[in-house]
Structure formats: structure tokens, C-alpha cells
From Swiss-Prot:
Family under the similarity heading: Belongs to the RelA/SpoT family.
Naturally occurring in which organism (per UniProt): Arabidopsis thaliana (Mouse-ear cress)
Role noted for this protein: Probable ppGpp (guanosine 3'-diphosphate 5'-diphosphate) synthetase that may be involved in a rapid plant ppGpp-mediated response to pathogens and other stresses.
High-level lineage: Eukaryota, Viridiplantae, Streptophyta, Embryophyta, Tracheophyta
Gene3D superfamilies recorded: Beta Polymerase, domain 2, Hypothetical protein af1432
Main location: plastid
GO molecular function, one term: ATP binding
UniProt keyword list: ATP-binding, Chloroplast, GTP-binding, Kinase, Nucleotide-binding, Plastid, Stress response, Transferase, Transit peptide
UniProt xrefs under PROSITE patterns: HD (PS51831)
Name under which the protein is recorded: Probable GTP diphosphokinase RSH2, chloroplastic
Enzyme class: transferase
Gene, per the UniProt record: RSH2
HD domain span: 233-337
A biological-process GO annotation: guanosine tetraphosphate metabolic process
């Protein structure tokens, strides 16, 4: 009976949401525990070769269900298994207290089908136009009353957290004493309560029931963990989630933001999150983990300094995970960059370089311009501190927010008076890094940069563009030679707009861009999108382009709710999705983007050889055999014993040995090349080692002196 009781205690996860490992229920059902234990010990079938990084970092549903409970701090970091290193993204933590158990992983309970490595938006995206439905706190979704605290999700279907159903929140709905799920109030640290209350004051989404639950799960998972800045790790989780909330992310994304490091840095597993928060959140957290592991590989191999390979990583990040997971990773990196001062100068340089070459362009691909600007400026500060200080001093008085606001008000009134309606009127300051880059590229001084301040106006039609241009020139004096008519004379990539530079108050130049809705959509999501035309001429396949455009659109659409841009048109007439661009995906909208089997462009594959990673481009339909041909059928290498050996390369595709060399490579595949020593070389090695051993015995005999004759 004692043995059976012990098995029951340690074969199941805690029964309540925030229980500690010290609270053990004595109400045991030995029969049911025994069966669940045996089922959890059953081995799962061997995983087939599946393309993509999603196969490299195996999901919980295809891992072996036989796992032992062990402390996280004793885990072995083995490069061949590509385990995640907690040093990634500023995780220099000290574990003053942590949980000494790992919840059982009920792998066979929730089996998921293998998905293609190229999948975007795994979880459902809300596109409902109906108002949010109020959910009673006393009833389940199916109308039944809750029978107890453990029935929180009774009646919820899988992926309910990703649906368009939302709560109508009250101002005090986030208090602990109103929670409908069990919470051991005595175990909650005072700093955690204060952190939650401050977050609720900053954004209303932190009053959401699922967000509060995720907050306390994150507190439990990261309890005792500290960052290099000596702040509690929980604070980083909250700041990451806050960044997501501030750009309009829904509760599913915010919950995943709170839990984004739990799989890598705590006892939590994919199945634990799946049981408590649903597949939508679990998939996002798993996606962030995969991105972190790829980021670590790239940083260890200095990929950021290899321009072409860094460019290939951008579509690969979007190919291997949900676009919203990329968004969470960007928020994680942005907050890490804000606290980069806590690391050594060497680490600051390394992280800043990676961020500038990989993450800032990725934010640009997704259309999150505010994050792109912040990331670039923070990188500029750490990579070029002297130039950053100099630019900051020179432009300290130039960044006049009041001037931009005044210009918007002035133009708005003039447009109304002229009877010109518009969709968007917004202003911006050019970032420090953008100004510095433009000065270097075009060899200009600060006074010669005329687009430090800018306005953008989006109107109905082409005729209104020219009418609005006349209004602008009537308000401010035009700078001669700075009018560019890209409507009549489009750029080579199809970009169309009117650009003009005027002088505000006679001293400060102000650039004004005027375009129609169609021109704006083409510039942001279509062929003219500037993220496509990075220097170096890196060209993406049509499938990758469509995938990135869709991800960019979804992120922009989700963030539109937080836009503060002025409009003279009702919201029902605002900019609509570009139906002609995403015709192929609207059939399943808002489901995830489905890969196109007729991919005709290049694929990017990660090749690991001699513990070094490279991102290589292969034509469509390339095979493992083609990769080996490029690497060479074999190479003559000199061994440590001076014996030349012809080594054959033995490939592993996504951690699985390859027997069929005709297997086609897919976007995001990881191929490890290890040398296979022929039998004749092994014979020579053994003979040489035997001779060395014999010489060693001769030297060690009594009376024998090395280097002296007898």
C-alpha cells in the first residue's frame, strides 16, 4: 500500500492551478492512478521524418511519453539534441527556489497531427464584427451552473481561448477574491500581487480571467528566478505581455506572452499548458520555444554577421511558427533590449548585433514599425555609443512632438474646409538610427536630411491626392526640387505616392506623403513593400512572399484596434483587407494559412557540419543527395595520428538518420552532417593506437629512461 500511494503521488500533476508541491491530497484512487501511470509509460511509435524546424524541435505529442521526474537545474545541455540554453535572451538566472518535480506528461492523451514546417497562424483568428458577448461568471458556456472551482473550463471546447468570444470586463474584475478558479492566496508573494495590480491599471486586458490565471501560473513557474538586472523574472513576463497588449493583441496572445518562457525555464510542459489553457496558447508557447532555439543556434554561429544568411532567416522564422509566435518573440526581444545594460559589454554587443540584423528586419516584415524603430535605436545605442550620443545631442531639440500634433490639426481643418475626406492622417519622427544610416549611405549632414518629421495622408482617389497636395502647399512653403510624383512616374517596384517637403514655421522641414488606399496596400503588403528590397538582392520564392504578406496583414489587422491615427471617415468605411492579394486564403479565413504544394521557388535549409551552422539555399525539389553533392561526397582529412582518411558524410534530417537520399528538402529542414569513418581507416586507427600503447608500456618499465641510450 505504501508503494502504491507513492506512485499515485508522483505520477500526477498538482490538482489546483497554483498549488505548491508541498500540498498533497490524501483522497487517492489507487486503481485509476495505476492505469493512468501505466498508460503514461507506454512508448509512442517512432516519429517519421517530417520536414521543418517543427520536426527538429519535436512537439510534445510525438515525444516519448516515458519521462522521469528530474530537477531542471540538473538537465544536461547536449548540442546534438539542440536543447535550449537558458542563456538565450538574457536568462542569466539564479534559482534560489524552484519546484523539485516535473508534472507527468500525458502524451497519449492529446495527439496532434504532424503539420507542415511552413504553417502560419495555427490558432484561429477572430474576425467577428459582432460586439463581444458577455459571459456570466456563474454559468458555463453550455448554460450549466458550475459545481465547484475545479469546473472552470467545464463545457469549454478545445481552442475556446482562441475564439472570438470575449468577456465584458468590469473595473474590479481582476481581484483575487473574485477569481472563479482555486488560488492559494497565502502562497502568492506580495510583489506578485502588486505587479498584477499595476499591470491592471496600465491595461484592462490584465483583468481578463484567463490572463489573471496565466499570471499566477507564470509566477509559480518562475518563482525564485531572477534576471541579470536583479529583477524578478516574472516582471519580464509581464512586460512582454504588456508590449503585446499595447499593440492590440487579444487575450490568447497575451496569455502566451506571460507563459512564453515556461516550457524552457520551468517544470511546465506543452501538455500542462494544453490542459490548463487550451491548444491555442500551448501552440504559441511551443512556437516561441522553437524560435528561441533557432535564435541561439544563429547567435552561436555568428549568423548575424553573414548578411545573406541573416536575410534567409527572416522568412524561415515565419515558416517555422505561427505569425503570432513571432510577434511574442519580438516582444520578448524588445524588453530584453531595454534591459541590456545589466549584461557585460561583450554580451551587449552580441545581442545588439543579432537584434539589428535579424529581429529588427523581422519586425519590419510584419509591419510593426514602432517596434522596429525601438529595436534599431536600442541597437544603435549599444553598438555605436559615441555616435548615438552625438546624434542624440544634435537632434534633442528637433524631435518636437507638439509640432507634429499642430501640423496634423492644421492640415485636418484645411482638408475639411476644402471638402476632402481622408482615411488616415498620421505623423512620425524619423528614428535616430534611420537618420544615421541615411547620412552614411548618402554622405549627408543632419541639416540635409529633410524627412526627420513627416505626415502621411491616405485619401479616396487619385484626384484627391493632387487636391490635397494643393492644400498642403497653401499651408506651408514648398522646398524647391523636393516634389516627387510617384503616381505619374511609379518606382520600378510599382510604388506610387506623392512626396513633398515643406517648411513648417520657416525653419523645420516637414515631408508629406499622399496616397490612395490601393497605393497604401500595395506599399505595405504588395509587390512594392519595401521589406522585399533589402540591399544585397536577396530574392524570396513566391510562396514565401505570399506567406510573409499574409502574416504581415494578420498582424496589422490585429493591431489596428490600437491605432491612434486620425480619420475623417467612419470605421465602417476604413481600409479593408486586400482581397485580391489573399484570394487563396480567404476560403479558410480565419484558419491558418495552408502551404501550397506547388512551390517553385528556392528553399532554405540549415546545415550543421563540424558544430557550425549555415543557412543554405537550394532549388525547389532538391534532395538530400543534392545537399551531399554540394558538401562533397567525401573529403581527405588528416587524423590526429597523421593517418589520411577518406570520410563519408552521414546525414541526419531533423535529428533522424536518413536512409533514402532521394528525400526532398523542405523549407526549414535541419540537416546534420557527421563523418562516417570507413572500416579500413578504423583498422589503421586501431593499429596506430596499439603501437602508441606499446611504446607507453616500454617507457614506463623500471630502469627505462626516455631519450637515453642503454
Amino acid at each position: 500500500m505504501v508503494v502504491a500511494t507513492t506512485i499515485a503521488l508522483y505520477a500526477s500533476p498538482p490538482s489546483s492551478v497554483c498549488s505548491t508541491p508541498h500540498q498533497i491530497s490524501c483522497d487517492l484512487d489507487l486503481t485509476s492512478r495505476s492505469s493512468s501511470t501505466s498508460s503514461s509509460m507506454a512508448s509512442s511509435p517512432q516519429k517519421p521524418i517530417v520536414g521543418g524546424l517543427s520536426s527538429l524541435f519535436s512537439s510534445a505529442s510525438v515525444k516519448s511519453s516515458s519521462s522521469s521526474s528530474c530537477s531542471y537545474s540538473t538537465a544536461v545541455d547536449e548540442f546534438s539534441s539542440l536543447r535550449y540554453d537558458r542563456s538565450d535572451d538574457l536568462k542569466d538566472l539564479s534559482f534560489s527556489s524552484s519546484f523539485g518535480y516535473s508534472p507527468a506528461k500525458f502524451v497519449n492523451s492529446f495527439r496532434r497531427d504532424h503539420q507542415s514546417p511552413i504553417s502560419v497562424l495555427h490558432g484561429p483568428v477572430s474576425c467577428s464584427c459582432s460586439p463581444p458577448m458577455r459571459m456570466s461568471r456563474d454559468r458555463n458556456l453550455d448554460g450549466s451552473f458550475r459545481l465547484g472551482a475545479s469546473r472552470l473550463f467545464n463545457g469549454f471546447v478545445r481552442k475556446a481561448l482562441g475564439s472570438c468570444v470575449d468577456y465584458e470586463l468590469g473595473s474590479d474584475s481582476g481581484l483575487v477574491d473574485e477569481l472563479t478558479f482555486p488560488m492559494e492566496v497565502d502562497t502568492i508573494k506580495p510583489y506578485a500581487r502588486d505587479l498584477l495590480r499595476r499591470a491592471q491599471l496600465r491595461h484592462k486586458i490584465f483583468n481578463d480571467e484567463s490572463v489573471i490565471k496565466a499570471f499566477y501560473e507564470a509566477e509559480k513557474a518562475h518563482r525564485g528566478q531572477m534576471r541579470a538586472s536583479r529583477d524578478p523574472y516574472l516582471q519580464h513576463c509581464v512586460e512582454t505581455a504588456m508590449l503585446l497588449a499595447n499593440i492590440g493583441a487579444n487575450s490568447t496572445v497575451v496569455v502566451a506572452g506571460l507563459l512564453h518562457d515556461t516550457v524552457d525555464d520551468s517544470f511546465m510542459s506543452y501538455d500542462y499548458i494544453l490542459r490548463n489553457f487550451g491548444a491555442g496558447v500551448a501552440d504559441l508557447v511551443e512556437g516561441v520555444s522553437k524560435l528561441s532555439q533557432l535564435s541561439k543556434l544563429a547567435r552561436e554561429n555568428n549568423t548575424a554577421c553573414k548578411t545573406v544568411e541573416a536575410d534567409r532567416l527572416h522568412p524561415m522564422f515565419l515558416a517555422m511558427a505561427d505569425a503570432r509566435a513571432v510577434l511574442i518573440k519580438l516582444a520578448d526581444r524588445l524588453h530584453n533590449m531595454k534591459t541590456l545594460y545589466a549584461l557585460s559589454p561583450v554580451k551587449q554587443q552580441r545581442f545588439a548585433k543579432e537584434t539589428l540584423e535579424i529581429f529588427a528586419p523581422l519586425a519590419n516584415c510584419l509591419g510593426i514599425s514602432t517596434w522596429k524603430v525601438q529595436l534599431e535605436n536600442l541597437c544603435f545605442k549599444h553598438l555605436y555609443p559615441n555616435q548615438h550620443n552625438e546624434m542624440s545631442t544634435m537632434l534633442e531639440d528637433s524631435f518636437d512632438e507638439a509640432m507634429i500634433t499642430s501640423a496634423i490639426e492644421k492640415l485636418d481643418q484645411a482638408l475639411k474646409k476644402a471638402g476632402i475626406s481622408y482615411h488616415v492622417l498620421c505623423g512620425r519622427h524619423k528614428s535616430l538610427y534611420s537618420i544615421y544610416s541615411k547620412m552614411l549611405k548618402k554622405k549627408l549632414t543632419v541639416d540635409e536630411i529633410h524627412d526627420i518629421h513627416g505626415l502621411r495622408l491616405i485619401v479616396d482617389n487619385e484626384g484627391d491626392c493632387y487636391k490635397a497636395l494643393g492644400v498642403v502647399h497653401s499651408l506651408w512653403s514648398e522646398v524647391p526640387g523636393k516634389l516627387k510624383d510617384y503616381i505619374t512616374h511609379p518606382k520600378f517596384n510599382g510604388y506610387q505616392s506623392l512626396h513633398t517637403v515643406v517648411m513648417d514655421n520657416g525653419t523645420v522641414p516637414l515631408e508629406v506623403q499622399i496616397r490612395t488606399q490601393e497605393m497604401h496596400l500595395q506599399a505595405e503588403f504588395g509587390f512594392a513593400a519595401h521589406w522585399r528590397y533589402k540591399e544585397g538582392g536577396c530574392k524570396y520564392s513566391s510562396f514565401v512572399l505570399q506567406m510573409v504578406e499574409w502574416a504581415r496583414w494578420v498582424v496589422t489587422w490585429h493591431c489596428e484596434a490600437m491605432s491612434k491615427d486620425r480619420s475623417s471617415i467612419s470605421s465602417s468605411d476604413s481600409i479593408k483587407p486586400p482581397l485580391q492579394v489573399f484570394r487563396l486564403t480567404l476560403e479558410d479565413c480565419p484558419a491558418s494559412y495552408k502551404p501550397n504544394s506547388s512551390q517553385d521557388g528556392p528553399v532554405y535549409v540549415i546545415v550543421i557540419e563540424n558544430d557550425k551552422m549555415s543557412v543554405q539555399e537550394f532549388p525547389a525539389s532538391s534532395t538530400v543527395s543534392d545537399l551531399l553533392s554540394r558538401a562533397g561526397p567525401g573529403s581527405s582529412r588528416w587524423s590526429m595520428y597523421g593517418i589520411p582518411a577518406k570520410e563519408e558524410l552521414r546525414p541526419r534530417l531533423n535529428q533522424i538518420p536518413v536512409s533514402d537520399l532521394k528525400w526532398k528538402l523542405k523549407m526549414g529542414d535541419v540537416v546534420e552532417l557527421t563523418p562516417k569513418i570507413p572500416d579500413e581507416s578504423l583498422t589503421e586507427y586501431r593499429e596506430e593506437i596499439q603501437r602508441m600503447y606499446d611504446r607507453g608500456l616500454a617507457f614506463s618499465r623500471p630502469g627505462t629512461m626516455v631519450g637515453w641510450g642503454s
